[in-house]
Structures are given as structure tokens and as C-alpha cells.
Amino acid sequence: MTGPGSAASALRRWTDVATVGLFIVILLGFLDTFTFSALGCGREWPLCNGGVTPGPSTQAQVEYWHRAITGVAGILAVVVVVWAWRRYRHPLEVRLFGAIALVFVGVQATLGAIAVFAPESAPIMALHFGFALLAFAGLGLMDIVLRQLERPETGWEFRQRGLSPGLQRYIWAVLLYALALIYWGTYVAHRGAGEACQGWPLCNGLLWPGFHGLEALIFLHRLGALALGILLGALPWVARRDRDARPDLWRGTLVVLVLVALQIGSGAYLILSHLAVNAEMLHVSLVTALWLGLSYLAVQTLPPSQPRPQSGRSGAS
């Protein structure tokens, strides 16, 4: 027989798998877009060109496997969330983050089906990516909470210590700003504006090219990315007073600082590579990791729903 600890570890491991699955779905979504495979299965869903298997074309294969892996990852996400809910009535964080994951898995799947019939709609495609990020963050945060339930000293107990109100407001403001910037970047990509600014850091040889047409879209994204880099570059200074009391936030701050530096570098590589697919995948991977890192920091600024969770079966019937 397996004990409560073994069951909790099994749940956490499967949640790890489900979280990685949603990460892969996000990457496949962008691969689908940048290989022009969105209509590889025609304007049909869930069928692919009238059948249940794809044709021989590369675009059909990419779109088919994007749909298939999305379906498997979505089902696995539902399974682990329901499993976690049945195992843990408390703390509230398990139920809340699980609910966020389920809601946005459903929403992004619905938008994905709509996108089949409107693949040229940049706002819909950007929303599709944004909701996928929210689903990924919800499941990723539930995964982190499950780890903290097994070992509260890994982060749960730090949340009881409090922190400077200014740091909390700063982190949440940066999180919301980052979400808006990610949406804008996705919108720019789906508008086909990625190469409107040739070269980096200059735009078509100009430091300030002005705001005209597609050039304005990508230039605004660059300015927004620069602002995010400055905001996160200042985060260690804002968090300096809480460094000793909140090592979780301090370490997280350094991680997101590295991630945003890599993200800006990957953006430069993307432009200089003329939107190579591998550069695009790197850019999307880093922004997804950065989003989860910022979401973790934001959650760690909030007090826990209960003082100290008990490892094992917490509040389950």
C-alpha cells in the first residue's frame, strides 16, 4: 500500500507532467503560426481535411499534432486539478490556481477552435496565446503550491513574514504590465510586423524611426520591452530591504532579472536571424518562463490562506 506521502508525490509528479504539457502546447501554437500551418487541416475542427488523420503535407502534420497534443495536455490538466481538489480541501491556493487553470484551458481551447475559422484575426490569435499563458501559470502555480505543501520551508512559511507594501505593489504592477506587453508582442507577430524594423537595436538604421504603419507596431514593442527591462532591473533595489527576511523573493527577483535579460537578447536574435523558427521558439520559451516567474513572485507577496499547511492529505475527506 502507498502512504499519504507517496500519493502526494505522485500527484505532484503528474502535475509536473501536465505543466510541461501546457508549455509544449504554447510552443506548438507558435510553431503552427510561423510555419503557416494554421490552415493545414483546412477550416475544419475537430476533423483535419475531412478525416481523423492528417494528410502528407508538413502544414497538415504540424496543425494535426498541435491539436492532438493540446487535447491530451488539456485532459491531463483537468485530471490533475480534479485530483488535487479531491485530495486537498485546503489550502485555498490549490483550489484557486486549479480553477484558473481549468477556466483558461477551456477558454483557450475555445479560442483555438474559433481561430481555425479566423486565422487572420491578430486580436483573436493574441488572446489565444494570452489565455494559454494564464492556463499555464495557473497550473504552474498549483504545482508550486503542491511542492510547498510537502516542504513548507520552500516558500510557504516565508509568506507569513510579510514584506514592504511598496515591493508588493511594484511586483503586481510589473506583472500586469508584462501581461499587456506579451499580448502586444503576440499581436505584432500575428500582424506580420516582425521584420518591419530591420536591424537591432536600431530600427531601419534609425534610433527613432517614428510611428508609421507596421513599423510603429514593432517599434512600440521594442520600447515596451526596454521599459520592462528597466523595471525588472530596478527590482533588486526595490527588494533590498526585504532581502534577509524574504530570501524567496530575493532569489526569485534574481531569476526573473536573468530571464528578462535573456528575453531581450532572444528578441535581438529573432530580428537578426530574420525571424528564424528556432529563434522564435527560444523567444516564446523565455517569455513563458518569465511569465511564470513573475506570477510566482506576485503570489509570494500575498499572505498564505492558512498559517502552516500539513504535508500529506490536507483537509481532505
Per-range role (PLM):
Residues M1-S317:
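Polytopic transmembrane helical bundles with strong interfacial aromatic enrichment
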